[in-house]
């Protein structure tokens, strides 16, 4: 049930391969603070390669001999990648730890230190990405499009991973709204998030289709850069236009829940039309305690760099048409959202997933 997602800059000319090898996708988590050195929580900074965040959390719980609920992290990170992130373990007392004997497959401990507060979900500034794309075609078009993205941003769509394989989490959300019980709290949360994301993506897609993605209008709700603070736009003047151009404010779309839409005039009409087409979601979400919130529709990439790799630099192949790009994204935003606007990419981990599924299936059949 995934919707078609309109491109802001038209369909990309270039194509290429993503994650031909795990080291082609690197993520570096950035927290807004560093551990202070004392407190009940031990913060462990790790580099993981080809390892799932939940798997690492479970292994840390075993190592520290605590319940899994006492291990926290700011956000989930890709499995098929090299990622650096923090974990927090609740270990009251003054015991000093030496983690030299911590042995988790694919995990390297970078540092660890105590802190006086729990590491909570979402408590990160954002992530820096360093990606290598291989077999890139139409290099000139690729570099020109990258420059457009740097200057103008991309639609802040929720990535496909938000919706599960084939958009299955959206279907499960519909089952939830029709009365099916889901006891697992995390799964229920995933389905509700998928439903909200579906509405948001639908509104965003409609704004692009109606050519008002980058046009502020009376009745819009704008969000201040670097914050979640929003305000209703009563008047459009040259000052607000300039603030939008300077990326000081952004247009928003609804994260659906109980309460009235914050928009008015034409923006509210557009949002209400999308809601009418998705009544099951819009009537179901408030029943689970979710309230109306807003999310910016423009994703701005920052701290960007692009490098065309020579054959000497790209050890994976003799003749290189590989490109390395790096950029920073705020928390809750997806690198794949940037990539889909940049090129038609094939994620090579899809093949890995299929091979692993086949192997696991064969093992179960023979058990």
From Swiss-Prot:
Annotated TRUD domain residues: 153-300
Coiled-coil parts of chain: none
Cellular component aspect of the GO annotation: cytosol
GO BP field: tRNA pseudouridine synthesis
EC number: 5.4.99.27
CDD domains on file: PseudoU_synth_EcTruD
Top-level class of the enzyme under EC nomenclature: isomerase
Catalysed reaction equations from the record: uridine(13) in tRNA = pseudouridine(13) in tRNA
Pfam families, per database record: TruD
Entry-linked Gene3D superfamilies: TruD, catalytic domain (3.30.2350.20), TruD, insertion domain (3.30.2340.10)
Annotated active site: 78 (nucleophile)
Keyword set includes Ubl conjugation: no
GO molecular function, one term: tRNA pseudouridine(13) synthase activity
Cited HAMAP family: TruD
Function noted in UniProt: Responsible for synthesis of pseudouridine from uracil-13 in transfer RNAs.
Protein name stated in the entry: tRNA pseudouridine synthase D
Organism of origin: Colwellia psychrerythraea (strain 34H / ATCC BAA-681) (Vibrio psychroerythus)
Lineage, opening ranks: Bacteria, Pseudomonadati, Pseudomonadota, Gammaproteobacteria, Alteromonadales
Gene designation per UniProt: truD
């Amino acid at each position: 049930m995934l919707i078609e997602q309109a491109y802001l800059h038209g369909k990309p000319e270039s194509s290429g391969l993503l994650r031909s090898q795990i080291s082609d996708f690197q993520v570096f988590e950035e927290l807004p603070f560093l551990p202070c050195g004392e407190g009940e929580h031990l913060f462990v900074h790790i580099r993981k390669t080809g390892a799932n965040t939940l798997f690492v959390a479970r292994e840390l719980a075993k190592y520290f001999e605590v319940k899994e609920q006492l291990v926290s992290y700011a956000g989930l990170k890709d499995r098929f990648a090299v990622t650096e992130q923090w974990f927090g373990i609740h270990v009251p007392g003054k015991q000093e730890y030496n983690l030299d004997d911590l042995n988790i497959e694919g995990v390297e401990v970078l540092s660890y230190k105590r802190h006086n507060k729990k590491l909570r979900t979402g408590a990160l500034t954002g992530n820096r990405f360093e990606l290598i794309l291989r077999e890139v075609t139409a290099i000139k078009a690729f570099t020109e499009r990258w420059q457009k993205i740097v200057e103008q941003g991309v639609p802040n769509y929720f990535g496909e991973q938000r919706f599960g394989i084939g958009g299955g989490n959206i279907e499960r959300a519909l089952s939830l709204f029709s009365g099916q019980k889901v006891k697992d709290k995390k799964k229920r949360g995933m389905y509700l998030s998928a439903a909200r994301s579906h509405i948001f993506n639908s509104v965003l897609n409609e704004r692009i289709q109606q050519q008002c993605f980058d046009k502020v209008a009376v009745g819009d709700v704008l969000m201040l850069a670097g914050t979640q603070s929003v305000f209703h736009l009563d008047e459009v003047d040259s000052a607000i236009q300039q603030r939008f151009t300077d990326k000081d404010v952004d247009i928003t779309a609804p994260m659906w829940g109980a309460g009235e839409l914050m928009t008015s005039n034409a923006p509210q009409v557009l949002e209400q039309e999308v809601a009418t087409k998705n009544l099951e979601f819009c009537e179901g979400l408030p029943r689970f305690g979710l309230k109306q919130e807003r999310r910016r529709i423009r994703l701005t990439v920052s701290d960007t760099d692009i490098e065309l790799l020579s054959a000497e630099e790209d050890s994976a192949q003799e003749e290189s048409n590989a490109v390395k790009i790096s950029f920073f994204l705020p928390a809750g935003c997806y690198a794949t959202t940037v990539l889909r606007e940049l090129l038609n990419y094939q994620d090579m981990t899809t093949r890995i997933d299929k091979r692993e599924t086949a192997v696991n299936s064969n093992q179960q059949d023979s058990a």
